[in-house]
């Protein structure tokens, strides 16, 4: 039961994290929008950069990117909360039923990992060369979040071997 509860609490912590991220991105919209804008414009990358042809200068596209990120984070938060509730309801269930209840959490964590790795590290970091910016480099934060979600995903994905008590 302790392992099951541990998995629920860790997933709830991820849900809270995403809830706070969405809260911060909406209540401090401009600060976080500036991050997205500068990454897409590539205006703080290294001088002489030959990849600047990739830069996007359209404010409308910057807004679409940013709103898409917020939406992705909000969906991840909702799915994590929903999965946490499903798992809590299955705390006393059979191992098979508890494992089944974890599936939505596995999907939610995967969705979160795709944002940090796919959007921030791959697209932001490599396509828009975010790693070259001293001011707008979010690669470290993205890697931290990707790693945290990955560890929780691995732990959550372990099969439940305890019998219900």
Where are these regions (language model features)?
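Extended, low-polarity transmembrane helix blocks
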Residues: 1-24, 65-67, 71, 75-165
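Helix-to-loop transition at the C-terminal end of transmembrane segments
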Residues: 23-31
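Membrane-interface interhelical connector segments
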Residues: 30-61
């Amino acid at each position: 039961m302790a392992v099951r509860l541990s998995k629920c609490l860790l997933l709830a912590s991820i849900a809270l994290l995403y809830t706070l991220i969405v809260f911060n991105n909406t209540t401090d919209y401009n600060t976080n929008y500036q991050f997205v804008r500068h990454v897409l414009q590539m205006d703080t990358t290294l001088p002489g950069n030959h990849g600047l042809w990739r830069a996007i200068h359209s404010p409308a596209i910057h807004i679409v990117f940013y709103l898409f990120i917020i939406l992705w984070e909000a969906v991840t938060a909702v799915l994590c909360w929903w999965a946490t509730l499903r798992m809590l309801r299955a705390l006393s269930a059979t191992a098979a039923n508890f494992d089944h209840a974890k599936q939505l959490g596995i999907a939610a964590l995967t969705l979160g990992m795709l944002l940090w790795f796919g959007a921030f590290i791959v697209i932001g970091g490599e396509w828009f060369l975010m790693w070259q910016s001293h001011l707008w480099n979010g690669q470290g934060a993205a890697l931290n979040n990707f790693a945290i979600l990955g560890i929780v995903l691995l732990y959550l994905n372990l099969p439940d071997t305890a019998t219900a008590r």
